[in-house]
Amino acid sequence: MTDKTPLTESGELEYGVAFNGELHYDFEMGLSTMAQTYQALDATEAACGTTEGAKADLYYRMALMVFTLRRLGTIPPEALTPELLLDELTAEDYDRLLDATIAVKKKRQRTKNAAPDSGSPSSPSDTTA
């Protein structure tokens, strides 16, 4: 994988998001970055007047999903808004999107190397036989 390869995770929602008389299930989630977190906080403050409290927290979560989603069915990107997700997304489908964000992060995570093999015997008696 090169730096230019986008990290994504695809999946399907269980209940879907209704838009223009159609239910949309297929999604592709990208890597959530600090820039998207910043954008989501800005959107939350603009919509709620604050970033504190339960309502603002829920709006922030939907805004972050909007900025992280690469695709949700055939919904045009400009129509994918926190308000749409608040109106249409079920808690179960939110969990699926959240699981996808975790899966994308795991793809980016450094793999843990196994302990190096020193090539030396494990005990002194192994050398005498």
Predicted regions and their residues:
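Short, surface-exposed, charged amphipathic helix/loop patches that serve as local interaction elements
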Residues: 2-129
